[in-house]
Amino acid sequence: MNPILVLLCVIALGLLVGRVSFRGISLGTSAILFVALLAGHYGWTIPTGFGTLGLALFVYCVGISAGPTFFRGLASHGRAMAITGSVIVLTGVAVTWTSARLLGLPAELAGGLMAGAMTSTPALGAITQSSSDPAAVAVGFGVAYPIGIIAVVLFVQIAIKLFAKPGDSDGTDSASETSGQSSAEIAESNSIGRRVVRIANPVVSGKRPSDIVAFADSPCQMSRVQREGRWRPTPPDYQFEIGDDVMLVGGASEIRRVSETLGELQDTAEPVVDADRERRYVVVTSPEIYGRTLKELRLRSKYGVTIVRVQRHDVEFVPSARTRIEFGDGLVAVGEPDALAKIANAVGHRPRTVNETDLLSLVAGIVLGIFVGNLSLQIGEFSMSLGIAGGPLMVGLILGHFRRLGPIRGSYPPAAMLLMTEGGLALFLADAGLNAGANVVEVLMERGAMLCVAAAAIAIIPLLVGFAGSRYFGGRTLWQSLGATCGGMTSTPGLAVLTGATDSSQPATSYVAAYPVALVLITVAAPWLVELIG
């Protein structure tokens, strides 16, 4: 069969299998590896080079995506969650090394087990490219990956049942170290709603929304005021008056919290608004906007608009005054038509700038990353290099943070980023699985039970250490600790279980702080661990 056709068929079938969901859990793009292992077992092959190209593209895009939050998280209040993520990764490294020594596992097989148990495809790529036996790495990953996913999901469910107290699911978020961090108010889009509140508290009468502490601390926005029977965007000079009906946008728990300060929630029909003329989606490209909080920008007083939602990395959330706007954020603004035109120009919304993909910058960035990855540092008899995975990852992180290095741009449209990330990962997984498929049955027959035991240990022990450290030594809440633990394990399914169990923004807040640090650390540490074991 034509090798290119084999590659495309494996990817297509893998993506179809990845869509199969059982109780909310699916393999996603990683299912391509399992289909490729099966195809490789029956002798299907593809030309060399596809996997290397796919890996370089994948990790470079991962770096670009993580760059804006990675360095800021290390230097901000999210540091505590980043430490939790680091502890989890280092514990995973230690458990992997111990398991390899006790069970006599080959270094490459042990490295694949760690990447799978920690559900980290970038780590799989880093080990594969630096390994002398990439087939063993792929087999180890294939065995451990399902175990890693199930372990995190079950751990989160059990922890919630054991430690959650009545009322915890209401998600009342106290001020915490993560409250001022970028993306701190992320919430699942299906939990965002609108409610009408009637002003009844004399204390707020005559005050502006910006004067109310509840708005500053909560991911909840007041978008409209009812005037003469019509819902109008909140004017810049609006002051609360007893009897006013206002519209709040946010999660159910946050709306309840703010309404307790303002007055009484109203059980009314869905308000009718002029969304076509009084709401606009704009994308941030102006350096005068990104990197600053909504409180610092004062968009309502300057332009007469309210930012009711922010879309970042395919996640939509309601911001608070402390939310820091980032380059490429999609903002949903509510205001009068002329005010919306002004805010569109102010944030730098230019369709061509937002939607164009600079291919020259993409190629130059990957080439620079490969060059950096080939540089080696000699320490005695031990030689270290970032390799084909670590080099593009580091360059991507730097470009993602600074957005530009000379002529090389570090930002791409969200749709293009998703396509390049998923496309690169698909090429790499297909190549790795097809090359490893010939030996998969032999390895499983020889070490199957042993591999499952090691994978379970590598997945479970870091979970326990990370959660206990954050909860009992770090003094974090249950939701913060579980969010950071899922981030340290780079487990999106675990986060999905958390966000389904609470309206609180704390799980996603902590996940966002821990995830990029854990992702980078495990990608860099994984190939060095293999050398250490070997």
Curated annotation (Swiss-Prot):
PROSITE patterns per the UniProt record, alphabetical: RCK_C
Ranges of compositional bias, category Polar residues: 172-187
The keyword Acyltransferase is annotated on this UniProt entry: no
Membrane topology: Multi-pass membrane protein
Molecular functions per Gene Ontology: monoatomic cation transmembrane transporter activity
GO terms under biological process: potassium ion transport
Localization annotation: Cell membrane
Listed transmembrane segments: 4-22, 24-46, 56-75, 82-104, 134-156, 359-378, 382-401, 408-430, 445-467, 479-501, 511-533
Domain RCK C-terminal residues, every copy: 180-264, 265-349
A GO cellular component annotation in the UniProt record: plasma membrane
Protein keywords: Cell membrane, Membrane, Repeat, Transmembrane, Transmembrane helix, Transport
Top-level taxonomic group: Bacteria
Record bears the keyword Membrane: yes
Region (Disordered): 167-187
Family of this protein: Belongs to the AAE transporter (TC 2.A.81) family.
Protein's UniProt name: Uncharacterized transporter RB4869
